[in-house]
Each structure stands twice: as structure tokens, then as C-alpha cells.
Curated annotation (Swiss-Prot):
GO terms for biological process: formation of cytoplasmic translation initiation complex. This is Eukaryotic translation initiation factor 3 subunit G. Belongs to the eIF-3 subunit G family. HAMAP family: eIF3g (MF_03006). Residues 109-126 have a biased composition (Basic and acidic residues). Component of the eukaryotic translation initiation factor 3 (eIF-3) complex. It is found in: Cytoplasm. Residues 1-32, 81-100, 105-126, 181-215 are annotated as: Disordered. Keywords: Cytoplasm, Initiation factor, Protein biosynthesis, RNA-binding. GO terms for cellular component: eukaryotic 43S preinitiation complex; eukaryotic 48S preinitiation complex; eukaryotic translation initiation factor 3 complex. SMART domains: RRM.
């Protein structure tokens, strides 16, 4: 009897031939226990080719959380695009879930900061700088009295101007100005500073009017209105527009806070003609402006 020749196989099919010598791993098993846990048994080969059995015990815990209904509704939206077939929840290959940091502000967060009231150096510095704020004695603005635009036409608030001018009082800068009448006399104190406009026999109001009681000096002295109870949101242009209805306005000064830029509640309006100032005072006194009632009166002039 002739021998039957064994068919020759291609070398590419050698890997596909299972001769039964390769050991297979058992299928993973999942066992449900009586206490509600699950035992998952799996098998694998380690680096030495040894078969390793892995047993994991898993307990499923349901965590109930009260969330915004809008958030819960968005979680039920159907996915689209390349993630249309993905299950609910974030997919590991398309979504990176970071750590959920819950921010809970404390009601006593100020106590956690450094208590500056217990710092002796801070208190000493506050006491040192307490009286360093510049304040004008004429209009209460945040500038030196010597630089006040109304120093030649108004007396300091709450004070009566001395005869011969307002230059005899103290200034914010600590300098002592001699009285105008004594500035040009032989008894003037040596070394005291006298403004150029007040040297000699000149008096206040003469530097722009020519002589004492000059036309411009009288007009500037008697045609300035002091407006109080002004809203902190007011602007100089708004005040100019309101008062220009009664005549030509030559100057508008609105005192503002240096830090916030808001109005400090008072302003000065100067008219070219006193008759226009009288009409404006009678009409605008008690006028409502930005939910406040304006108080308009003639500014105190220097006597």
C-alpha cells in the first residue's frame, strides 16, 4: 500500500497552527456575593511567562447628590458626532476629568488675615500721617489755601475776613503771611513772604481790575455763587449748562475727591454780571438736581 503524502503548508501559516502545546488562560469570572459585593477573577501572564490569578472584590455604592435641575437635564442630552455611540458619562478617550475642588468661603475670613490693629508700627505710622491731608480753608478742596482759585474773592469758611485782606491768617503749608497793609510799610517783619499781588499799597482785587474797587474786582467779588448739596455724580459741564441760562459764566469750580474722583458736595459759580448771578441764585436755590435739592447762595466775599 502506497504511503499518502502529507500536504505541504506555507510558512506564513505556521503561526496560525495550534498544535495544542500553548496553554490558554481561563475566562474571567464574576461572582455575586450575598452581601451585595462582586468578586471578579481574572488571569494573566507575567514577564516570566507564569500564569497569575487576580481576584478583586468590588462593592458598588450609590451616592445621591442634589444638583441644579438644569445640570441634571444637560447630563441626559444625547451625544453627537464621533461620540454618538458612547455611553452616558465622560469617555476616557475624549474627556479628561480633573479634580473637583469645592470652594467654600469662610464667614470669618477677615480674622484669618493679619490684625493690623495689634501692630505697633502700623499704629504709629497712622498717627504720624493722620493730619497730613491737605485741605483748603476757603473752599475745603484738596489743595493748599495759597493755590485756591477763590482766595482773592472769598473769605475762609466760618471765618470773618480781617480788614485789609485775608492774608493775615495761617496757611496749610505752615508759612505766616503778613497782612497786606503791613506788607509795604516800614514795620513789615523782615523775612516774611508777601505775594507779589499784595506788595506795596495794593489790595486784593486790584491785580486784575487796575485799582481798588476796580470794575473787574467788584464783579468777581460780588458775582460768585456757592452751590451746596451737589450730587457726587455731578460734573462741571452740567453745572455750567444749568447756570449759563441766566448769563455768561466765567468760572466753574467743582470740588472733587482726589482718590475717587467723585464730587464732594459743593461748587462755586462765577458770573460776569452780578444781575445774572442774582437771577440764578433766586431761580436755582431749591432746584432739584440728580435727586438732591440744591442750596445756592452768594459766596462770602473778602472785606
Amino acid at each position: 500500500m502506497a504511503a499518502v503524502a502529507k500536504p505541504v503548508q506555507a510558512w506564513a501559516d505556521d503561526d496560525d497552527i495550534d498544535d495544542g502545546t500553548t496553554e490558554r488562560l481561563p475566562d474571567p469570572q464574576t461572582i455575586v456575593n450575598k452581601d451585595g459585593t462582586k468578586t471578579i477573577i481574572s488571569w494573566r501572564f507575567n514577564d516570566q511567562g507564569q500564569k497569575v490569578k487576580t481576584t478583586r472584590r468590588v462593592r458598588l455604592t450609590t451616592h445621591r447628590e442634589v444638583v441644579n435641575p438644569r445640570v441634571a437635564e444637560r447630563k441626559k442630552w444625547e451625544k453627537f458626532g464621533l461620540s454618538a455611540k458612547d455611553g452616558p458619562g465622560p469617555a476616557s478617550d475624549t474627556t479628561s476629568v480633573g479634580e473637583n475642588i469645592i470652594f467654600r468661603p469662610s464667614a470669618n475670613w477677615r480674622k484669618d488675615q493679619k490684625d493690623e490693629s495689634k501692630d505697633a508700627n502700623a499704629n504709629a505710622m497712622k498717627d504720624k500721617l493722620k493730619d497730613k491731608k491737605v485741605k483748603c480753608r476757603i473752599c475745603n478742596g484738596e489743595h493748599f489755601t495759597a493755590r485756591c482759585p477763590y482766595k482773592d474773592t472769598m473769605a475762609p469758611i466760618g471765618e470773618a475776613a480781617p480788614a485789609g485782606g485775608v492774608g493775615g491768617g495761617g496757611d496749610d503749608e505752615g508759612g505766616i503771611l503778613s497782612a497786606p497793609g503791613a506788607a509795604g510799610g516800614a514795620g513789615a517783619k523782615k523775612g516774611s513772604y508777601v505775594p507779589p499781588a499784595l506788595r506795596g499799597d495794593r489790595k486784593e482785587g486790584e491785580k486784575m481790575g487796575g485799582g481798588a474797587g476796580g470794575k473787574y474786582g467788584e464783579r468777581d467779588d460780588l458775582a460768585t455763587l456757592r452751590v451746596t448739596n451737589v450730587s457726587e455724580m455731578a460734573e462741571e459741564q452740567e453745572l455750567r449748562d444749568m447756570f449759563e441760562r441766566f448769563g455768561r459764566v466765567t468760572r466753574v469750580f467743582l470740588a472733587k475727591d482726589r482718590d475717587t474722583g467723585l464730587a464732594k458736595g459743593f461748587a462755586f459759580i462765577s458770573f460776569a454780571d452780578r444781575e445774572d448771578a442774582v437771577k440764578a441764585c433766586n431761580k436755582m436755590d431749591g432746584w432739584g438736581f440728580k435727586h438732591l435739592i440744591l442750596r445756592v447762595e452768594f459766596a462770602k466775599k473778602a472785606t
